[in-house]
Amino acid sequence: MSAKPIDAMTLAQARREHSRLGAEIAAHDARYYREDAPTVSDAEYDRLRRRYGELESAFPELASPDSLTKKVGAAPSEKFAKIRHRIPMLSLGNVFSEAEVEDFVARVRRFLGLPTEASLAITAEPKIDGLSCSLRFENGEFVQAATRGDGFEGEDVTANVRTIAEIPARLKGEPPEVLEVRGEVYMTHADFAAMNVRQQEAGKPLFANPRNAAAGSLRQLDPNITAGRPLHFFAYAWGEILPAPPAGTQMGMVAAFKSYGLPVNPLMVLCHSAEELIAKYRSIEEKRAALGYDIDGVVYKVDSLVLQERLGFVSRSPRWAVAHKFPAEQATTVLRDIEIQVGRTGALTPVARLDPVTVGGVTVANATLHNEDEIARKDVRIGDTVRIQRAGDVIPQVLGVVLNKRPAEAKPYVFPDHCPICGSAAIREIDEKTGVADVVRRCTGGLICPAQAIERLKHFASRNALDIEGLGDKQIEQFYHDGLITKPADIFTLEARDKAALKKLKDREGYGETSTRNLFRAIEQRRAPALNRFIYALGIRHVGETNARRLARHFGSFSALRETGRAAAPGSEARAEINNIEGVGEVVAEAVADFFAEPHNEEALDALLAHVNPQPMEEIVSDTPVAGKTVVFTGALERMTRDEAKAMAERLGAKVAASVSKKTDLVIAGPGAGSKLAKAAELGVETISEEDWLKLVGRA
């Protein structure tokens, strides 16, 4: 069913759809960030967000300070030494349609305040499907290499990268004193096929695809193994450069890389409109099969480095770049069963069990069915022949049914209204404000549901949370069922309890002296986690990695967050403080308050904090006049856009709030400032002009 045109809607109709979309997007955010189990493709998610934004543009009454957050990476393995990226190594946002490309260009122009007639140069280049890597050269000499990791910390793969023939030990010409070159390590189709032949002849497992082969080869503990693998590299970006970049444009930087002897992709071109970008996308897509290496889209980047600096970043991706992904590959197969999985928040997720089929070079035997509404809408039945795709080339999903192949005995699927694990009622929560039912059905078993407890423990120890090496899903399930770990604090008392136990962990099947010692050491190394990781690990509803980072930066310590969360009753100053953190909003504020209001959570935290001491995050900038201060922008700004001003303030270490309160340190007011300016005067908060702000931060 097609959506009703927005210009044909009444305010009441728009409000209903806005509420429904908000609930749906919030549910998708929750499943992506907190449960690591997204149920829609990036393309579908982006379309939902765009529709949501279009409704607010047409009906400004619907807009609120709340923002929806974006995604994240994976923590480095304990098997490698870690390298802290001096400049974060972030990922790109994705688009999947020509309309979204046009929207990207329009957003960039709006953010920069460019008039229609002003030229905007944007590069286009193939998106290599490999493993991102950062190479550091000092005085022209290659000295270090690191994987992306979680974007802030990666794995030290220096010895392995030295074996890649295309990467010079010394750069040609006169490169900067310090140059961090970033790019993609990949494997060609021919090399991949030849390597799999050797694997088969040696009786070893075959690699699924060139990307997996490249990633596995680069992350070998023995560099001699990497040396025997045919890896290649394309340079396309950079991190730290001292004393200054050798060029002022993206094209110029890549040309400089080439002059230094680094391999760059020859298909990179300069475009000046969305139409030219789309034409280049089509051209590269036509060449895709003949390139000899895997690509999964085309990357667009604003060419000017000055404009890139102005555009800055949103969440964990740049505003000045985006990846235009190729359509996901599809296949048909038979759906043999529908299994209901229970997540750590009690969400019941239907998973299709399929006859194995190859999609995009990967064998798929399971696919998401999203939720009960999607099953009903698509009328998916056990025994149906279904169309599946790897959404965004990653997450398999069922697209629909091939009706002319439906068996006569296939019956409509009835979604369970009780938890398949603990038998508790499973309900769809109703939003008290909107009256809209949640798209996800949840088990009400809470603390008595083993599935939820196990999934919460898995999340707590997962890579993007506390990242406890050796304590994976399988181990947690085993330890839970054996009564060894039933709550987070149990992880940190495991070694002490094991010493007193009659049957030692090392004597269990699958364990031994070494693996047990390594596990205990990994646990010990997580007694002082970064505050943002600790907050994320707690599994607070609506608090994914991005919001955990925002809360950590704002409060600085877990005790401060806990104190505010305890006091965050509706209408309180504490609730307002959380709500006013830029990008957080009321939904998260309510979830934080609910979490700390639950006595069982408080008991679990007391037990956990007896063994764990969360550490404050490193400040972005600590030596600026506004570092640590809470600022509010109001009225029209003349030298920069509102988004640009907020991004600048955050880079300088300030906290940007959406409204004025007693905790506001500074209000920057432009022409047309209204209620916020009046509130600042009432509370005695210092108010300055945009010009004074720029002088204060040294940007006048």
From Swiss-Prot:
Residues given in the record as NAD(+) binding sites: 42-46, 91-92, 125, 148, 184, 301, 325
Reaction equation(s) it catalyzes: NAD(+) + (deoxyribonucleotide)n-3'-hydroxyl + 5'-phospho-(deoxyribonucleotide)m = (deoxyribonucleotide)n+m + AMP + beta-nicotinamide D-nucleotide
Active site: 127 (n6-amp-lysine intermediate)
Enzyme Commission number: 6.5.1.2
SMART domains (alphabetical): BRCT, LIGANc
Keyword annotations: DNA damage, DNA repair, DNA replication, Ligase, Magnesium, Manganese, Metal-binding, NAD, Zinc
Protein name: DNA ligase
Organism, scientific name: Methylocella silvestris (strain DSM 15510 / CIP 108128 / LMG 27833 / NCIMB 13906 / BL2)
Lineage: Bacteria, Pseudomonadati, Pseudomonadota, Alphaproteobacteria, Hyphomicrobiales
